[in-house]
Protein backbone atom coordinates (compact mmCIF):
# COMPACT_ATOMS: atom_id res chain seq x y z
CA UNK A 1 0.00 0.00 0.00
CA UNK A 2 1.15 3.54 -0.83
CA UNK A 3 -0.24 6.53 0.97
CA UNK A 4 0.70 10.11 0.13
CA UNK A 5 -0.07 12.73 2.76
CA UNK A 6 -0.21 16.52 2.33
CA UNK A 7 2.12 16.68 -0.66
CA UNK A 8 2.75 20.27 -1.77
CA UNK A 9 5.12 21.57 -4.44
CA UNK A 10 5.55 25.04 -5.91
CA UNK A 11 7.66 26.46 -8.69
CA UNK A 12 8.28 30.09 -7.76
CA UNK A 13 4.81 31.59 -7.17
CA UNK A 14 2.99 28.74 -8.93
CA UNK A 15 1.61 26.10 -6.51
CA UNK A 16 1.49 22.96 -8.65
CA UNK A 17 0.55 20.46 -5.92
CA UNK A 18 -1.53 21.70 -2.98
CA UNK A 19 -1.78 19.23 -0.07
CA UNK A 20 -2.35 16.15 -2.24
CA UNK A 21 -3.54 13.05 -0.36
CA UNK A 22 -4.00 9.66 -1.96
CA UNK A 23 -4.07 6.04 -0.94
CA UNK A 24 -3.33 3.15 -3.29
CA UNK A 25 -3.81 -0.43 -2.12
CA UNK A 26 -1.54 -3.30 -3.17
CA UNK A 27 -2.55 -4.56 -6.62
CA UNK A 28 -4.37 -1.36 -7.57
CA UNK A 29 -3.78 0.17 -10.97
CA UNK A 30 -4.36 3.91 -10.81
CA UNK A 31 -4.38 6.43 -13.64
CA UNK A 32 -4.17 10.17 -13.12
CA UNK A 33 -5.83 12.14 -15.89
CA UNK A 34 -5.88 15.93 -16.09
CA UNK A 35 -4.97 18.70 -18.54
CA UNK A 36 -1.35 19.50 -19.37
CA UNK A 37 0.53 21.50 -16.79
CA UNK A 38 -1.57 20.47 -13.79
CA UNK A 39 1.12 18.56 -11.90
CA UNK A 40 0.88 14.90 -12.93
CA UNK A 41 4.58 14.66 -13.79
CA UNK A 42 5.54 16.65 -10.71
CA UNK A 43 3.50 14.29 -8.52
CA UNK A 44 5.34 11.23 -9.88
CA UNK A 45 8.70 12.95 -9.60
CA UNK A 46 8.00 13.91 -5.96
CA UNK A 47 6.86 10.38 -5.09
CA UNK A 48 10.08 8.98 -6.58
CA UNK A 49 12.23 11.68 -4.92
CA UNK A 50 13.37 13.23 -8.19
CA UNK A 51 11.78 16.52 -7.07
CA UNK A 52 11.72 17.66 -3.46
CA UNK A 53 8.35 19.11 -2.36
CA UNK A 54 7.90 21.78 0.31
CA UNK A 55 6.02 19.22 2.40
CA UNK A 56 4.57 15.74 2.22
CA UNK A 57 5.01 12.18 3.39
CA UNK A 58 4.87 8.79 1.73
CA UNK A 59 3.92 5.67 3.65
CA UNK A 60 4.94 2.49 1.88
CA UNK A 61 5.51 -0.97 3.28
CA UNK A 62 4.90 0.30 6.80
CA UNK A 63 7.67 2.89 6.52
CA UNK A 64 7.01 6.64 6.55
CA UNK A 65 9.31 8.85 4.49
CA UNK A 66 9.36 12.64 4.68
CA UNK A 67 9.43 13.49 0.97
CA UNK A 68 10.50 17.07 1.69
CA UNK A 69 13.94 15.92 2.84
CA UNK A 70 16.63 13.84 1.21
CA UNK A 71 17.84 11.28 3.69
CA UNK A 72 18.67 7.61 4.01
CA UNK A 73 15.01 6.53 4.20
CA UNK A 74 14.17 8.32 0.95
CA UNK A 75 16.99 6.47 -0.80
CA UNK A 76 15.65 3.18 0.57
CA UNK A 77 12.21 4.15 -0.72
CA UNK A 78 13.64 4.79 -4.20
CA UNK A 79 15.16 1.30 -4.22
CA UNK A 80 11.70 -0.29 -4.04
CA UNK A 81 10.15 1.92 -6.72
CA UNK A 82 10.58 1.66 -10.46
CA UNK A 83 9.75 4.46 -12.86
CA UNK A 84 9.33 4.59 -16.62
CA UNK A 85 9.61 8.14 -17.87
CA UNK A 86 7.76 9.84 -20.71
CA UNK A 87 11.14 10.00 -22.46
CA UNK A 88 12.65 6.56 -22.11
CA UNK A 89 16.29 7.54 -21.59
CA UNK A 90 17.69 4.48 -23.34
CA UNK A 91 21.42 4.37 -23.97
CA UNK A 92 21.78 4.85 -27.73
CA UNK A 93 25.02 2.86 -27.99
CA UNK A 94 23.67 -0.13 -26.09
CA UNK A 95 21.37 -2.87 -27.37
CA UNK A 96 17.93 -3.52 -25.92
CA UNK A 97 19.42 -6.31 -23.79
CA UNK A 98 22.27 -4.09 -22.55
CA UNK A 99 19.79 -1.32 -21.69
CA UNK A 100 17.76 -3.69 -19.51
CA UNK A 101 20.91 -5.09 -17.86
CA UNK A 102 22.22 -1.59 -17.12
CA UNK A 103 20.09 -1.03 -14.04
CA UNK A 104 20.62 -4.44 -12.49
CA UNK A 105 22.93 -4.67 -9.52
CA UNK A 106 23.71 -8.38 -9.77
CA UNK A 107 26.53 -10.42 -11.28
CA UNK A 108 26.84 -10.19 -15.06
CA UNK A 109 25.82 -13.77 -15.79
CA UNK A 110 22.62 -13.54 -13.76
CA UNK A 111 21.74 -10.07 -15.09
CA UNK A 112 21.60 -11.41 -18.65
CA UNK A 113 19.07 -14.10 -17.71
CA UNK A 114 16.92 -11.59 -15.82
CA UNK A 115 17.09 -9.07 -18.66
CA UNK A 116 16.15 -11.69 -21.27
CA UNK A 117 13.19 -12.82 -19.14
CA UNK A 118 11.88 -9.26 -18.85
CA UNK A 119 12.38 -8.57 -22.57
CA UNK A 120 10.37 -11.71 -23.26
CA UNK A 121 7.70 -10.57 -20.82
CA UNK A 122 7.18 -7.34 -22.80
CA UNK A 123 7.37 -9.04 -26.20
CA UNK A 124 10.85 -7.79 -27.10
CA UNK A 125 13.03 -10.93 -26.77
CA UNK A 126 13.60 -11.15 -30.53
CA UNK A 127 14.84 -7.53 -30.52
CA UNK A 128 17.47 -8.04 -27.79
CA UNK A 129 20.42 -7.20 -30.09
CA UNK A 130 18.87 -4.11 -31.67
CA UNK A 131 19.86 -0.56 -30.78
CA UNK A 132 17.24 2.03 -29.78
CA UNK A 133 17.56 3.88 -33.10
CA UNK A 134 16.30 0.73 -34.83
CA UNK A 135 13.26 0.42 -32.55
CA UNK A 136 9.93 2.21 -32.85
CA UNK A 137 8.79 4.50 -30.05
CA UNK A 138 6.51 1.78 -28.71
CA UNK A 139 9.32 -0.77 -28.77
CA UNK A 140 11.63 1.63 -26.94
CA UNK A 141 8.93 2.10 -24.33
CA UNK A 142 8.67 -1.68 -23.86
CA UNK A 143 12.46 -1.88 -23.34
CA UNK A 144 12.18 0.87 -20.71
CA UNK A 145 9.36 -1.05 -19.00
CA UNK A 146 11.46 -4.25 -19.07
CA UNK A 147 14.34 -2.31 -17.49
CA UNK A 148 12.06 -1.11 -14.67
CA UNK A 149 10.53 -4.58 -14.16
CA UNK A 150 13.98 -6.23 -14.04
CA UNK A 151 14.61 -4.44 -10.75
CA UNK A 152 11.55 -6.18 -9.24
CA UNK A 153 10.09 -2.98 -7.78
CA UNK A 154 7.30 -3.13 -5.25
CA UNK A 155 5.84 0.03 -6.78
CA UNK A 156 5.97 0.83 -10.50
CA UNK A 157 5.33 4.40 -11.65
CA UNK A 158 4.61 4.87 -15.36
CA UNK A 159 4.68 8.33 -16.90
CA UNK A 160 2.55 8.54 -20.05
Predicted region positions:
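Catalytic Walker B motif of ABC-type/P-loop ATPase nucleotide-binding domains
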Residues: 156-159
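A short, proline-enriched helix->beta-strand linker immediately N-terminal to the Walker B motif
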Residues: 150-154
Amino acid sequence: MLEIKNLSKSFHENKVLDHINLKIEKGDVVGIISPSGTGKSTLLRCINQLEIPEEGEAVFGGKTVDLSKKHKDSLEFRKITGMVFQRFYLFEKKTALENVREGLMVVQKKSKAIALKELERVGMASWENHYPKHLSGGQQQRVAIARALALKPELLLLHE
